[in-house]
């Protein structure tokens, strides 16, 4: 038994001097391998008297267990050390400046459309869409625009053929909605529209949002209240709003809504032409002939409609002075939004 204890102490002493995994494995083989010294001691059990066999077997097992635990602990220390060295070599220097990433954003026109749609959806309006190539019937006839009306002139409209045009407004969506749905009706119709015009304030294609509400006992006061609330929400300030009498063939009475200039707070500047007011949208009570074209009883129901140019509202909200910048794909401009 004393020999086993001495062998264990010797092995543990050698383990304390080990500096690498290879030497550690050599010691393991030397004492615990198939021909290791402690393994050979087990073979001596057969030569001992019966009363001595259990004592030697127990002593050898205790020695082997102690040695194995010491080897495992040493091995774990080596592996932890190797891992720490590897992590130190692969460490990322977080003090270095990061690599810049280009981050996309929504186009200002899209942002404006989303803002308009959000307000009207919150107020119970549905969103309806229609074809961009529109028939003469829906683009003009049903909107009380007869064949001799100036809006039909070639300099205003892109004609596809004698009976189809690139729509000049989204008002045709209103008629299509009235044909398939009885009041109450609350819709807005956003989309692209086309007109033969191109300068600093006009482009051949632009975006428009038109709205329609048809129900019983609808008045111009309802229209004014809704649009005033919309303009305050869109520009995020309490604006002065005025409604000027105007003319549109599809509404009667008709008006244009002006807001106090957001650039100069009504004091007068180049943007508002020193009037202190900016025109932002057109509106009015739906003409009885238009209701009739949509199969709505004008004696029973009334309605109001309104329309606004999305690019114009974008220009006013973001302080943009040239409409054409929206369509030039200049990243220096677009990155500002």
UniProtKB/Swiss-Prot annotation:
Q: Does the keyword Ligase apply?
A: yes
PROSITE patterns given in the database record: AA_TRNA_LIGASE_II
Recorded catalytic activity of this chain's protein: tRNA(Phe) + L-phenylalanine + ATP = L-phenylalanyl-tRNA(Phe) + AMP + diphosphate + H(+)
| One Pfam family cited in the UniProt record for this chain | tRNA-synt_2d
What Gene3D superfamilies has UniProt attached to this entry?
A: Bira Bifunctional Protein, Domain 2 (3.30.930.10)
Q: Which cofactor does it need?
A: Mg(2+)
- Bilayer-crossing residues are none
Q: GO cellular component annotations, sorted alphabetically?
A: cytoplasm
User: Which residues does the annotation say bind Mg(2+)?
Assistant: 252
- Please state the protein's primary subcellular location: cytoplasm
Q: Tell me the cofactor note.
A: Binds 2 magnesium ions per tetramer.
Q: Where in the cell is it found?
A: Cytoplasm
Keyword terms of this UniProt record: Aminoacyl-tRNA synthetase, ATP-binding, Cytoplasm, Ligase, Magnesium, Metal-binding, Nucleotide-binding, Protein biosynthesis
Enzyme Commission code: 6.1.1.20
Give one GO molecular function term: tRNA binding
GO annotation, biological process: phenylalanyl-tRNA aminoacylation
HAMAP family with a match to the protein in the record: Phe_tRNA_synth_alpha1
Say which family it is in: Belongs to the class-II aminoacyl-tRNA synthetase family. Phe-tRNA synthetase alpha subunit type 1 subfamily.
* Subunit structure and binding partners: Tetramer of two alpha and two beta subunits.
Q: What is this protein called?
A: Phenylalanine--tRNA ligase alpha subunit
